[in-house]
């Protein structure tokens, strides 16, 4: 059984002829070359679209341990597309990843991703389906001439940390017991349904 986790490796008591059971691979340099050739072929095939693929949303990692970090997610939610003024059908045609399962839980996250979509749309060069008959929203002929395939990430995620200026702690902040407050908020969320049901039953009995 293969070792799992950061544990001590067991002593291997080999009894069979183990030399001929060793797994070997000698195609690593060739695989590296093949991966590079496939990347280059794909870039030519999808040109002039970006090499990195679709635009992804910025999300926070789950769990209390990691939720201070941001990373690229699967796609944008329908609420974010609506806030940016882009339809779901249009988003799929202009290189935006859509994840219909995602729901926004904070106004800050919704605004950040909506702004990301607006920035992408402002920088986007949209080729017409028919060069002879461009439609509304397509880029101008001058923009099409300078268009080049993007080699790097699409709107790369910048991990910049902004520090607040030092200030005095206010009396109102001193009065808040944050640990107790968070426990209360979690309990209210957990038992909201049961408490509402209990209140309804009590109201019906009093009638």
Swiss-Prot record:
Q: Which Pfam families match?
A: Ribosomal_L13e
Compartments where located: Cytoplasm
* Record's keyword annotation contains Ribonucleoprotein: yes
Ribosomal protein keyword on record: yes
Q: Which GO terms describe its cellular component?
A: cytosol; cytosolic large ribosomal subunit
In the record, what lineage is assigned to the organism producing the protein? Eukaryota, Metazoa, Ecdysozoa, Nematoda, Chromadorea
Task: Please classify the protein's predominant subcellular localization into one broad category.
Answer: cytoplasm
Q: How does it assemble?
A: Component of the 60S large ribosomal subunit (LSU).
Keyword field: Cytoplasm, Ribonucleoprotein, Ribosomal protein
Give one GO molecular function term. Answer: RNA binding
Similarity comment text for this entry: Belongs to the eukaryotic ribosomal protein eL13 family.
Q: What InterPro entries has UniProt attached to this entry?
A: Ribosomal_eL13 (IPR001380), Ribosomal_eL13_CS (IPR018256)
A GO biological process of this protein is: translation
Physiological role: Component of the ribosome, a large ribonucleoprotein complex responsible for the synthesis of proteins in the cell. The small ribosomal subunit (SSU) binds messenger RNAs (mRNAs) and translates the encoded message by selecting cognate aminoacyl-transfer RNA (tRNA) molecules. The large subunit (LSU) contains the ribosomal catalytic site termed the peptidyl transferase center (PTC), which catalyzes the formation of peptide bonds, thereby polymerizing the amino acids delivered by tRNAs into a polypeptide chain.
Q: Which PANTHER family match?
A: 60S RIBOSOMAL PROTEIN L13, LARGE RIBOSOMAL SUBUNIT PROTEIN EL13
In Swiss-Prot or TrEMBL terms, this protein is called Large ribosomal subunit protein eL13
